[in-house]
Amino acid sequence: MAGGAMKRYAIVIEEAGANLAAYVPDLPGCVATGESADEVERLIREAIELHLEGLVEDGLPIPEPSSRVEYIEVNAET
């Protein structure tokens, strides 16, 4: 995808035992795990690039990023 149009995909990073896991809501099946935030972010970036390259090789469309990330504040007192 070098030289192609840049797209900005939302990622979700969750704790997974002793590691972190990341996935891309707009790219089902595109996941990565790592031992640190830096590692999992690097690995999910690589996974996204490989996923998109595979779609292009298979003649499939590249999904447009459509997921939004918002945080909602709630009263958590019990």
Residue locations for each model-derived region?
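Short beta-strand micro-motifs enriched in acidic
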Residues: 14-16
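Amphipathic, hydrophobic secondary-structure cores in small proteins
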Residues: 18-55
